[in-house]
């Protein structure tokens, strides 16, 4: 049923033309995944509240509303502003194309009907020793829109969005909200063809109720600068693609979180038809992966690290028969991921650290990689910001996640329509 819903919503010729109709009322829980304010690390983010309300409908209007003042290439526009879209703003072909060279980076050759061949731009050494060929990409997808501090970008209704380019938050910008939009079609099938959202040295960010599909590089990327006080909630990450690293119609380029000292809550998102990087983490900091739904996934879900703390709780993994490791980890990685099968060994550690019990995730595959490294909990206990942000989230049980997240992730007619 979930696959049918996704095909209806993410048609390859239109962007978010319908809205989920099922509403789950989660009585008795206080997880604010669907509320009008962020919880977790991004709590307190207000965006453009109190500022001018600007309605935009063209590429030029949107670019100007997001940032009106620059210092060099850095946006320094910190004027509070609420920017509203009620349509899809298409940047495709607005900046022309570039013809260059590329190669096939994967070790396998894809052919119809299993999937078109994924290509990579000839950047760095990626095409070293490989056969190169002419490759043309759309420039707008690699020229992201700069977002200034104190901005809210929100779609009115379920059919608003940005096509053909993404958003960049860098240079120390802070207090930004991106809600209820689709961001799609950035050089699909061309690796390094553009990111949907890039966060590099930015803080206090809430990315909520958006949908991402057919992105050339990452749907969300952080790094190498800090990405602090970030909550990513209620989003649909749809990996269905005509291309694919593994020739199976699933994207491997979903979310790469490699910001310095990052602090990110990933709450109630839907990762569908992915084949890795959901997310991949590195560099340093804390990631709270909570109440996310995974469907029809292949190979890796979250990829752990020895440098970043990962607390994974209350997630629901349903790869639908695919070869899949929900949490890719090895001993020594900083992972604390309780399951029903191992949670008894933690004793009172969660309640002592967080002021509440940890919530177990559900999976039928890869259970051996759900580590319980108590170093993660010690690190949380020793960091007041982490302890408060994680402890403030009240996860729902994993058996409620599938219906709730499938019904509510992505853009909606009213993103605040579901109450607790």
Q: Which residues does each PLM region occupy?
A:
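Acidic glycine-/aspartate-rich tracts in secreted/extracellular proteins
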Residues: 60, 88-91, 158-159
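N-terminal secretory signal peptides that target proteins for export/translocation
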Residues: 1-11
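Extracellular beta-strand-rich solenoid/capping regions of secreted or surface-exposed proteins
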Residues: 67-78, 93-152, 161-179, 185-202
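Extracellular beta-rich repeat passengers
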Residues: 281-283, 288-420
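Acidic Gly/Asp/Thr-rich repetitive segments characteristic of extracellular carbohydrate-active
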Residues: 34-82
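Bacterial N-terminal signal peptides
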Residues: 17-29
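Right-handed parallel beta-helix
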Residues: 149-159, 174-185, 203-217, 227-247, ...
